[in-house]
Amino acid sequence: MSEAAAVKFRVFTLNCWGIRYLSKCCRERYEMIVQLLSQERHDVVLLQEVWSEKDYHFLRSKLTNTHPYSVYFRSGAIGSGLCVFARYIITDSFLYRYSLNGYPYKLHAEYCREKDYYLPHRLLQAWELGQFIRHTGKTADVVVLGGDLNMHPCDLGNRLLQCYTGMKDSFLETEQFEGCEGGCTLLSQNCFASVGDTQSFPSGIRIDYVLYKGSRGFSVKCEHLMTTNGTPPGRNMPYSDHEAVCATLSVQKDENVVSEQRHVEKTDPQLVDILNEARAELKIGIHGAEKVRYSSGRMAILGFILLLLEVVMAIIPLVTTTPENSFPKVSFYILGMVAFAVALLAGILYVFHTIEVKMLQGTEDQMSNAIQALQERLGH
């Protein structure tokens, strides 16, 4: 084993909840975040929900001395809300959009845990994220994933992501922890947190993570993990509705770990079980999306028929000797607009759910192929 000195690498992640004019005390909280980052001087800072470019420019101007390098990921009409600050040069950056929903900045939120309609969406996104990590991380010495993943530690999507990629959870692996009980990052006592999110979890929820893995002869371990704990001393409000997470990673060159890091090539029976479970959930999602697509299609046809009847009623007086249509004109126009709106909206929904079905089916096929490949290796 190489005796090269270990390199300390500090990663900070925070969902800033920075919806300008809607989120409470945005500017005051950004000033608190700037002060924290300037004092702690993390190597890499990963911020989410910085929705306004003005807020990003404010952060960049204040962090010039401690974090001179940064990138703001622009996407769509409202942006991605993602930005990265670093003490070292950022040589390259890339924004990947999930194929379903098109969000580049998050896995789909869990709006109702009991009736989670978006579970198949999050599984698809976790699968795509896992594939992205596998394909882009092959030439990297160290891979780090940080942010709000909108998944509990034991959720299927989280298990799929970690088992498929070999990423390690810094909270579970750390040698020393300091912060909220259980590493929770969404606390009921946080004055900015939504009551609905934490009502079923009075002790809090852990949905913000720093995941990591080494490769190409580098071993990585988490020496220290820290979370903020509500309102900091001397302040009258927390940094955000989420708690920040800071991981101190120790990276050391070690040629003996090459075979251990090739997680992709391991024939893991647990991964087969997780993929089968994920496929079952995707099939449920496909069935639900097909039902909604069918209903949308019927509604679009109904709207089109009503619109066609309107056209016929308008043409009849022009081509016959029948007296002018006695149907009230105002009601006639209103009915026409309603029919057009129903046909248009239902048609858009039909197209959207058709895309949803195809994306879910494609992911289910990919998982099926992965299971077959794993089972073949297990059989040999």
Regions found by a protein language model. Give the residues of each.
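Metal-dependent phosphoester-hydrolase catalytic domains
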Residues: 120, 131-144, 150-380
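Conserved SAM-binding loop and adjacent beta-strand
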Residues: 24-26, 122, 344
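Active-site beta-strand/loop signature of hydrolases that rely on acidic residues for catalysis
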Residues: 10-17, 29, 33-59, 85, ...
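Generic structural signal for helix capping and beta-alpha/helix-loop junctions
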Residues: 21, 54, 102, 153, ...
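Conserved beta-strand segments of alpha/beta enzyme cores
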Residues: 10, 68-69, 89-92, 166-169, ...
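Structured beta-strand-rich core segments of catalytic domains in phosphoester-bond hydrolases
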Residues: 3-5, 16, 25-26, 37-38, ...
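N-terminal signal-anchor transmembrane helix
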Residues: 1-11, 16, 21, 26-30, ...
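Binuclear metal-dependent hydrolase catalytic cores centered on His/Asp/Glu-rich metal-binding motifs
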Residues: 106, 119-123
